Regions:
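Glycine-rich phosphate-binding loops of nucleotide-dependent enzymes
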Residues: 2-511
Length: 511
């Protein structure tokens, strides 16, 4: 046992039924280092982190913190050991202030001295370079500010070992850079940090070492300075990986969808889309970029008939230029009218698929209304499920297994495969590769390009700007429910898109 290790895992194993999530894993985290954890979906990264944080308990193995063997049976145990975890989905109370969230749940007697506590929190924030108004309520904050609250909350509770799950998933490039500066400051102060991410360039820019897992097994830990994106990818998948994203030239481009003056409000009567005008062309991939909550999700849902429209028009044009108005139609009406539109939602299990149902039954969700018999036809959906499993290499014991048991990447393959099988004229995809490993991401990029070549109008909300710039023909940037710019994917830069994500000025071209 090395004295310089803040954390060491020895021979850790964890299984869920017949599924071996972690298989005799060894891992070390040095004091004052940033360690990246890499692996494909289903490689056991999250399970391993959840055992360190006390959400799961290992079946076998030993955990050491600062050289001493410990037992972690709950997040309370991890807190007491100085371990904190910031999940991808934040655990905050919207109606409380930042300061109130940071101290929420801490032991104490009587009334809290919030003035003194706020001063202490502010000193901690200033120490590491956080910029945050502690008096603001959570619902008033941006995603990056909410993440800041989560990190400060862990530090205030004494965390010296910090685990971050996909920390930049919904941040702009500028926000990501600020976060990296803060993490480097924390490292200088003696904190040890573990990050789970699929963004290889961020791993190379930020981490000191990289640990790789594959199919539940520990593969190796390498010094970041001696690695590159290609070598890390090959270690993750166990073979050669092509990291290039193709962008074939658009052919026979024609208007497919015309959106004019689109306005939407949420249940609280707050405007989510504000006078949006946009043309979507057949035979192209239109990328939608923006900070989380800028209206991207609502834009796709409005087209798909899942979002009430206050005003405006959404016109679907056929090959002869004849238009069908979609505004005012719900998703069932769109389906019954035979309009060939497919939608891959952000919420894969919930809105997209039913987690407790198997692949065959999830295929039927798209077709059961079209049956002419009182009995459900399972032959077609079963054949489609088998085809998707084979062609997209879906990792599942059987098509009869509930999709909830699959990793995120395999769930996404099932969902995208089902929607593409409808032969749509318009394909709407929200966050196609969020939380998805490199190999699966490239499978999905290939599928989207195949649809583009077939003349489908593809609209993609993508959070990774590197991917947006490599994959998309045009990029519409949303900010505060408005379109702040429409750029050519071949000439735009990451910095330009990042700035447009924080501006409300209209710009760009509809061409």
């Amino acid at each position: 046992m090395g004295e310089n290790y803040a954390l060491e895992l020895r021979d850790i194993s964890k299984s869920f039924g017949s599924v071996q999530a972690n298989d005799h894993v060894d891992l070390t985290l040095r004091k004052s280092e940033i360690l990246a954890i890499l692996g494909e979906n289903g490689s056991g990264k999250t399970t391993l982190m959840n055992m360190i944080y006390g959400i799961y308990y290992p079946d076998e193995g030993h955990i050491f913190v600062n050289g001493k063997e410990v037992t972690i049976r709950s997040p309370k145990d991890s807190y007491e050991l100085g371990i904190g975890m910031v999940h991808q989905h934040f655990k905050l109370v919207d109606v409380l202030t930042a300061a109130e969230n940071i101290v929420l749940g801490l032991p104490g007697k009587g009334k809290l001295d919030m003035k003194r506590i706020t001063e202490d929190i502010q000193k901690l924030a200033d120490k590491y370079g956080f910029e945050l108004d502690l008096s603001h309520k959570i619902y008033e904050m941006s995603v990056s500010q909410k993440q800041t609250v989560e990190i400060i909350k862990m530090l205030y509770r004494g965390a010296r070992i910090l685990i971050l799950d996909e920390p930049t998933a919904v941040l702009t490039p500028q926000e990501s850079d600020r976060l990296f500066d803060i993490l480097r400051n924390m490292r200088k102060d003696g904190c040890s940090i573990m990050i789970i991410t699929h963004k290889l360039q961020e791993v190379l820019a930020l981490s000191d070492r990289v640990a790789i897992l594959r199919k539940g097994k520990y593969i190796d830990t390498v010094e970041t300075a001696q690695a590159n994106a290609q070598s890390l990818s090959e270690m993750m998948v166990g073979g050669r990986v092509d990291l290039n994203i193709d962008r074939p030239e658009p052919e026979n481009v024609k208007k497919r969808l015309v959106v004019k003056g689109l306005n939407c409000k949420n249940k609280e009567e707050v405007k989510t889309l504000d006078d949006v005008d946009l043309i979507v062309n057949a035979g192209e991939i239109l990328g939608i970029a923006g900070i989380s909550g800028s209206g991207q999700k609502e834009f796709l849902e409005a087209i798909a008939g899942l979002q009430a429209i206050e005003s405006g028009s959404i016109t679907l044009l056929d090959d002869n230029g004849k238009g069908t108005e979609l505004a005012g139609m719900d998703s069932i009406s769109i389906n019954k009218a035979g309009i060939s539109l497919a939608f891959v939602p952000e919420d894969r299990i919930g809105m997209g698929l039913v987690g407790d149902m198997d692949m065959t039954d999830n295929m039927m969700l798209r077709s059961y209304r079209n049956g002419k018999s009182p009995f459900l036809d399972r032959k077609g959906p079963k054949a489609l499920a088998l085809k998707i499993k084979e062609q997209l290499e879906v990792m599942t014991p059987s098509i009869s297994a509930p999709v909830r048991q699959m990793s995120g990447g395999n769930v996404q393959k099932v969902l995208v495969g089902r929607e593409i099988a409808q032969n749509p004229k318009v394909l709407l995809v929200a966050f196609p590769t969020r939380g998805v490993d490199v190999n699966t991401s490239h499978v999905i990029y290939r599928l989207l390009n195949e649809q583009k070549k077939k003349g489908v109008a593809v609209v993609c909300v993508i959070e990774d700007l590197d991917v947006v710039l490599e994959l998309c023909d045009r990029i519409a940037v949303f900010c505060g429910g408005k379109i702040s710019g429409i750029e050519d994917g071949r000439t735009a830069t990451k910095e330009e898109i990042g700035l447009l994500m924080t501006k409300h000025e209209k710009g760009g071209t509809q061409a």
